Design a protein with these regions (language model features):
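Flexible, low-complexity linkers/stalks enriched in Thr/Pro that connect modular domains
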Residues: 1-10, 93-102, 185-194
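Extracellular/lumenal ectodomain signal focusing on beta-strand-rich modules
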Residues: 2, 14-17, 67, 75-77, ...
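Short, solvent-exposed loop/edge segments of extracellular or virion-exposed proteins
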Residues: 10-24, 102-116, 195-208
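Structural beta-strand segments of beta-rich domains
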Residues: 25-29, 117-121, 209-213
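Acidic, Ser/Thr
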Residues: 30-34, 123-126, 214-218
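Extracellular beta-sheet repeat scaffolds used for adhesion and glycan interaction
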Residues: 38-84, 130-175, 182, 222-231
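Extracellular and select intracellular beta-sandwich modules with Ser/Thr-enriched
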Residues: 87-92, 179-184
Length: 231
């Protein structure tokens, strides 16, 4: 009967590498092979597809790995073994699985209450990333909206309206797409001055050298006077 001698291994070509870094613990890798065969991998967790573990020739093949733990994957391979038992391998580009969110720590809260409508907040983060906030007015700095590790980061908000800001957050998103948030202490922006109204004026003329003046105010606060002798 006819028989075939085949000593040529399948040739694999990368189509789409695994995104890196990524928080996707079941990543996919796309490749082509010039021969059909059985697929295997050096990654110990294996793959969920294709199932069964066979691939065809001359079309894009997708391998989706089983759940992978966090870490750097270096020098890992996929292999196609043809019917003659020749094995052709392809080394995957190094990739990182990262599911840990950045951790943010407060350094200096926003002063409250304050009439500063562009307040600043200081914090640190253990991971670099992109900064965002749920305060709708946003921030003017940093610009671009990136932060680094190892030093105090300052965020300065755009002009904020008067009011109480409660439960607001800042968020750092790392390169793998993990979000770490920090809730700001409640703060108040108040640019409205107290309104004073006279109740009883100082009697005049008078021989009283320590006169009294009676008034009302719409807000509590610290009292001063332009009279140099004070009160």
């Amino acid at each position: 009967p006819d028989f075939v001698i085949d000593t040529t291994a399948p040739s694999l070509t990368q189509v789409t590498p695994i995104t890196t870094p990524s928080n996707n613990t079941t990543p996919s890798y796309l490749s082509t092979t010039n021969e059909a065969g059985t697929l295997s991998t050096s990654i110990s967790q294996g793959f969920s597809s294709p199932n069964p573990n066979t691939v065809t020739a001359d079309s894009i093949q997708t391998v989706t790995f089983n759940t992978l733990p966090e870490g750097t994957y270096s020098g890992e391979t996929i292999t196609v073994t043809d019917d003659a038992n020749n094995a052709g391998s392809l080394t995957l580009p190094d990739f990182v699985i990262d599911t840990t969110a950045p951790s943010l720590t407060q350094v200096t809260p926003i002063t409250t209450p304050s009439n500063n409508t562009t307040p600043s907040y200081q914090f640190t983060t253990n991971e670099a990333g992109t900064l965002s906030t749920d305060i709708s007015d946003g921030f003017s700095s940093p610009n671009p909206a990136t932060v680094t590790t190892g030093s105090t980061q300052t965020i300065t908000f755009n002009t904020l309206s008067d009011g109480t800001y409660s439960g607001k957050t800042i968020t750092v998103t790392d390169d793998a797409g993990n979000n770490g948030s920090l809730t700001l202490p409640d703060f108040v922006i108040d640019t409205t001055a107290p309104t004073l109204s006279e109740v009883t004026p100082i009697t005049t003329p008078s021989n009283v050298t320590t006169p009294s003046y009676v008034f009302n105010t719409t807000e509590a606060g610290t009292l001063t006077t332009s009279i140099s002798q004070g009160f």
